[in-house]
Amino acid sequence: MLKILIKIIGIYQRYLSPLTGPTCRFYPSCSTYAKESLMRHGLLKGLWYSAVRIMKCHPYHPGGYDPVK
């Protein structure tokens, strides 16, 4: 399951993300953050960290540097 999610994120990064251009207000981007958190923390914790990060991605959050912990 973990490898499938990482593959799906990779497909998104390769084929869909270039169509919208650089729109993420964070570094690393939310999709890169999700891949790194899944690889570092495993499925459940990685999904949790990814969901929290995506919920912070809105116009009222300043964004900036937010590495995977």
Swiss-Prot record:
Stored Pfam families: YidD
Membrane topology (UniProt): Peripheral membrane protein
Domain of life: Bacteria
Any single Gene Ontology cellular-component annotation: plasma membrane
Function description: Could be involved in insertion of integral membrane proteins into the membrane.
Family assignment from sequence similarity: Belongs to the UPF0161 family.
Protein name: Putative membrane protein insertion efficiency factor
